[in-house]
Amino acid sequence: MNNVFEIINQARRKNKLKRELQDNQKKIRDNQKRVVLLENMLDYIDPSMTTAEVITIVQNMKGDYEDRVDDHIIKSAEISKSRRDISRKIRDLTEADKKANK
């Protein structure tokens, strides 16, 4: 019976991680879009139109968004690994429970 509770607990954790992974992937997409936007802005901004400081600011913003994308990609990999570990544990617990009930 303890295995049943553990299986339920692990399944809930797995589902929570799945939702977190989806949320993280959305953040990756959003930040990648921002990077593209800023790249396009850099194509249109000209020193004669604005000051060189504006270009520097936009470049810094672009770098910040790229760093965020990298951070979210790393976080997604960590979450995926946790989900795989939980799936493996659920499978092992289920098999052990089946053997114990035979």
UniProtKB/Swiss-Prot annotation:
PANTHER family: UPF0265 PROTEIN YEEX. One of its GO terms (cellular component) is cytosol. NCBIfam families: PRK05423.1 (NF003844). It comes from Aliivibrio salmonicida (strain LFI1238) (Vibrio salmonicida (strain LFI1238)). Keywords: Coiled coil, Cytoplasm. Pole-localizer protein involved in the regulation of several cellular processes. The keyword Cytoplasm applies. The gene is tmaR. Pfam families: DUF496. Residues 7-34 form a coiled coil. This is Pole-localizer protein TmaR. InterPro entries: DUF496 (IPR007458).
